[in-house]
């Protein structure tokens, strides 16, 4: 498979995030991965993923995907003390794409905060399961 030029970042290696990131790796993307529990991210290193130690290590990617449990969790990984935005040393991803299912108000707040930094935010909650993802049939509803 030809290597794709875009650098992708991924936050969240749960039952949905892992197979979603794995499909990007199979498609030839350069994917850097962070998960709160590092051991959940490590299996993707064997498939070509780069497991990073800090969220701020994802600040240099082109597109950052996330899929976490709550809006509070998402704000923490983006804007928390050691988040992608606050912990960075330099640039930011051009686009943040969140695949979590969170409150509309949380998405709106995040979009506003990122827009102030000149960054685009796409809310893209997904519907399906790991089997659907592996078959390439995941559904997403995008806004932003």
Where are the model-predicted features located?
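Short alpha-helix boundary/capping motifs
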Residues: 52, 72-73, 142-143
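Rossmann-fold NAD(P) dinucleotide-binding segment
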Residues: 55-122
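Rossmann-fold dinucleotide-binding core
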Residues: 8, 101-144
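Short, glycine/charged-enriched secondary-structure capping and boundary segments
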Residues: 23-26, 46-48, 78-82, 110-114, ...
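A generic "binding-loop/recognition-motif" signal
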Residues: 37, 70, 126
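Surface-exposed loop/turn and secondary-structure junction residues enriched for glycine/proline
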Residues: 14-16, 61, 80-82, 87-88, ...
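Active-site-adjacent beta-strand anchor residues
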Residues: 34, 67, 100, 142-143
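NAD(P)+-binding Rossmann beta1-loop-alpha1 motif at the extreme N-terminus of oxidoreductases
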Residues: 1-66, 94-95, 130-133
């Amino acid at each position: 498979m030809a290597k794709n030029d875009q650098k992708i970042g991924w936050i969240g290696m749960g039952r949905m995030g892992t197979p979603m990131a794995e499909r990007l790796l199979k498609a030839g993307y350069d994917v850097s991965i962070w998960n709160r529990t590092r051991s959940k991210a490590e299996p993707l290193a064997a498939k070509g993923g780069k497991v990073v130690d800090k969220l701020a290590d994802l600040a240099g990617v082109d597109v950052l995907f996330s899929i976490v449990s709550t809006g509070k969790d998402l704000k923490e990984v983006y804007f928390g003390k050691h988040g992608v935005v606050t912990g960075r040393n330099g640039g930011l991803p051009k686009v943040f794409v969140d695949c979590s299912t969170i409150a509309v108000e949380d998405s709106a707040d995040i979009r506003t905060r990122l827009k102030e930094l000149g960054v685009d935010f796409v809310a893209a909650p997904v519907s399906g399961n790991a089997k659907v993802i592996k078959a390439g049939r995941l559904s997403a509803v995008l806004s932003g």
